[in-house]
Amino acid sequence: MTLLLRWVLRVCLVLAASIVLYVSVTAVQVWLTSRQTSENHANAIVVFGTAEYNGVPSADLEARLNETLALYQLGRAPLIAVTGGKQPGDLYSEAGVSAAYLHIHGVPLSKIVVGGGSDTYQNVQSITPGLQDRGVKTVLVVTDPFHEDRAMAILTTFGFSPSPDPTTSSPITGWATVPYFAKETIAVSAGRLVGYGRLSSTSHPSNP
């Protein structure tokens, strides 16, 4: 083996080890964040959308919305922002279904900021103007535990100060969360390196 080949092999091994270490540390951080719950008050609650079925919230979305209602009813924040767009062929957006659910359960429409978006970055991007117009700086973040780290990181890039309040009644539990934690670890690892905005543009090139 030539000296050059040995050097190349050594560099490759160091690079591979660095990548494994970086992803491993990120995985631990995503997991640790998932276990955090704040007791803070804030200017607004941001609840991230997920699947709806013909205008009816999925079990996961309903769990997030019920967590949001509990926080709102406790007076933890006076305003709620809902997010999530439409899947191809859908009649309703995730945000629209969320807003309707909250309103039916007693939240005035004037207290709901409706956004959209195809991913977490676009979700936050869609609600930022409405929140900024109302002077919102601090937010409580309602989503599944495994999604908290990325959601809060993106909210921070838009100038908000987030606190975690993950749903405690998600239907995704136990071993079923493993692929979700893996996905979030990859997304956070990539987002930190290239930027969440660039990652979103790559994933959804036709969207702003």
Model-predicted regions and their roles:
Residues T2-T37:
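N-terminal type II signal-anchor transmembrane helix
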Residues A27, G174-S201:
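A transmembrane-helix-recognition feature enriched in membrane-embedded lipid enzymes
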Residues A27-F181:
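A structural signal for short, hydrophobic/glycine-enriched beta-strand patches
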Residues P78-L79, A182-V188, S206-P208:
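Short, highly charged low-complexity linear segments
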Residues T168, Y196, H204-P208:
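Short, surface-exposed patches at the edges or C-terminal ends of soluble domains, predominantly
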